[in-house]
Regions:
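Carbohydrate-active catalytic/glycan-binding domains of CAZyme proteins
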Residues: 20-154
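Bacterial N-terminal signal peptides
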Residues: 5-14
Length: 154
């Protein structure tokens, strides 16, 4: 009986592994939901539209006219492919997971500050992007604001 149980466990592990490896990543598409399940959200309002930015592979974006029904925008503000090269130079091991965005308006522009880091290390950076309007898909990379140093703990 024990041999049969062990055999079953190995077969199950093999099936699970094959299934996980055989999966293909589906491209993200625009969709609408009444539950905005996001991390570290920050919201801004412009011209009758609420814009919610959040942690993700790049800066995620959802929009709403009523704050009840949210539309996910694929690629967000700064999608996985739009992350500036300086982030990888400043943060060794950075894997495009941008977190804790914050937004503010100054001098007739919108500004988003965001964090880049490598899990388990003390090297991080804060970047800044800007745009004259929230509705644009094009944001300007304003570069790095500050970085931490690996050899310092404070």
């Amino acid at each position: 009986m024990l041999r049969l149980l062990v055999l079953f466990c190995f077969i199950e592990m093999g099936v699970t592994t094959m299934t996980a490896q055989g999966r293909t990543r589906r491209p993200m598409t625009e969709f609408t939901t009444d539950t905005a399940m996001v991390h570290d959200p920050v919201m801004a309002y412009e011209d009758g539209v609420y814009y919610m930015f959040s942690t993700g592979m790049g800066i995620q974006l959802m929009t709403s006219s009523d704050r009840r029904s949210w539309t996910f925008k694929p690629g967000g503000v700064m999608g996985r492919d739009g992350i500036p090269a300086w982030t990888h130079d400043s943060v060794p091991g950075f894997r495009n997971h941008v977190w804790a965005p914050d937004i503010f308006r100054f001098n007739n522009r919108w500004w988003i500050a965001y964090s880049c880091s490598t899990f388990g290390r003390n090297t991080s950076a804060i970047g800044l992007i800007s745009s004259p309007t929230l509705a644009t898909p094009q944001w300007t990379d304003e570069g790095c604001v500050i970085t931490s140093r690996q050899d310092r703990n404070n």
